[in-house]
């Protein structure tokens, strides 16, 4: 009763795992595919650029991107997204239109 047992995980417990780099690449593709359904490409590019600029390695940038986009998608869906993104095209100004400061 007073003896302390060391707990050890058996070596053959569970299926073999894929290498971390492969898991990271697969997860990146999955999260990007899902994110494209809900957010404009300009947002995804900005998040990606932020991750690259604020981490020390490509692996860390991928991890950060996955974390941020996972949270963003979760919040987006929790707020009632119907599951599709419809990108709006920017409206072009009427032909012959010139901005006010552009008088020649």
Swiss-Prot record:
UniProt cross-references to InterPro entries, sorted A to Z: Lentiviral_Vpx_assoc_factor, RetroV_VpR/X
Keyword Chloroplast: no
Predominant location: virion
UniProt region (Disordered), positions on chain: 1-21, 85-104
Keyword Transcription regulation (UniProt): yes
Compartments reported by the entry: Virion; Host nucleus
UniProt-listed GO biological process terms: symbiont entry into host cell; viral penetration into host nucleus
Keywords, comma-separated and alphabetical: Activator, AIDS, Cell cycle, Host nucleus, Host-virus interaction, Transcription, Transcription regulation, Viral penetration into host nucleus, Virion, Virus entry into host cell
Pfam families: VPR
Cellular component GO terms, alphabetical: host cell; host cell nucleus; virion component
Additional detail: This is an African mandrill isolate.
Function, as annotated: Stimulates gene expression driven by the HIV-2 LTR. Prevents infected cells from undergoing mitosis and proliferating, by inducing arrest or delay in the G2 phase of the cell cycle. Cell cycle arrest creates a favorable environment for maximizing viral expression and production.
Quaternary structure, from the entry: Interacts with human UNG.
Record-given protein name: Protein Vpr
Organism from which the protein derives: Simian immunodeficiency virus (isolate GB1)
């Amino acid at each position: 009763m007073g003896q302390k047992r060391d707990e050890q995980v058996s070596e053959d417990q569970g299926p073999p795992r894929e290498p971390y780099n492969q898991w990271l690449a697969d997860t990146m593709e999955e999260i990007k595919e899902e994110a494209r359904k809900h957010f404009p490409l300009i947002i995804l590019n900005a998040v990606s650029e932020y991750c690259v600029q604020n981490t020390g390695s490509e692996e860390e940038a991928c991890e950060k991107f996955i974390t941020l986009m996972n949270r963003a998608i979760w919040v987006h869906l929790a707020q009632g997204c119907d599951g599709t993104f419809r990108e709006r095209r920017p409206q072009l100004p009427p032909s012959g239109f010139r901005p006010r400061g552009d008088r020649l």
